[in-house]
Design a protein with these regions (language model features):
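N-terminal glycine-rich FAD/FM-binding segment characteristic of electron-transfer flavoproteins
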Residues: 2-43, 58-62, 85-104, 179, ...
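Proline-centered loop/turn at the N-terminus of a beta-strand
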Residues: 47, 108, 142-146
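Short, well-ordered amphipathic alpha-helices
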Residues: 68-71, 100, 174-177
Length: 197
């Protein structure tokens, strides 16, 4: 059997006519019958929950600090931020559940942790299971979690990433929290608080 060798010209010829280039669309306004929801990072009316691991605390503290500063820069008030800490990344999914049960008015959550590869399989276990737990929580509860669980090979990689990762997570939480608010208002407009059922 011959080895596969990619042929760019043949590939391009095979695709010719199969795809239509879509012109850029302004995603901030109604375009014909398509309604686009404008992304928003305005945090002035949002309530955000944060779960931060204490293991590798130097990294988690740095991510928390940059997340907090970004939330504040976008208008989130201190009284609208709820924070708890847990021993490590594996405890984050359970804490997300408890935090959301205790504060059902949260608009979005942030999960902060740092998993650094060691010499055993434990790295894969913690990295995979904490991520799976966060994803399971999101799909079960219907609230967004900005996943800021950093998984890296070594401390040097973590040091390079911690500052921006926390700020990125804050922006994700803000945008998704606003989307949740917008969609919640649409549900109320369409069905009202009491639709008679």
């Amino acid at each position: 059997m011959a080895a596969f060798e990619p042929n760019a010209e043949r590939f391009a010829e095979d695709l010719k006519g199969r795809f239509v280039r879509i012109p850029p669309i302004n995603l901030t306004e109604k375009n014909g019958s398509i309604e686009f929801i404008k992304p928003s990072a305005d945090g002035s009316d949002l309530k955000i929950g944060i779960v931060s691991a204490r293991f590798n605390d130097w990294a988690c503290d740095a991510m928390f600090a940059s997340c907090y500063e970004e939330l504040k820069a976008h208008g989130v008030k201190d009284e609208n931020i709820v924070v708890t800490t847990v021993p490590g990344a594996l405890e984050i999914p359970g804490a997300l559940v408890m935090l959301y049960e205790g504060y059902p008015d949260l608009d979005a959550l942030v999960a902060i942790g740092c998993v650094i590869r060691g010499e055993t399989y434990h790295f894969e276990l913690v990295a995979n299971e904490s991520s799976r737990g966060v994803t399971d929580f999101v799909t079960t509860e219907g609230i967004s979690v900005a996943n800021c669980i950093l998984t890296v090979e070594n401390e040097e990689q973590a040091k390079v990433r911690v500052q921006e990762k926390g700020a990125d997570a804050a922006r994700v939480a803000l945008e998704m929290g606003n989307l949740r608010r917008f969609c919640g208002r649409r549900v109320m407009e369409n069905y009202g608080e009491d639709n008679g059922q």
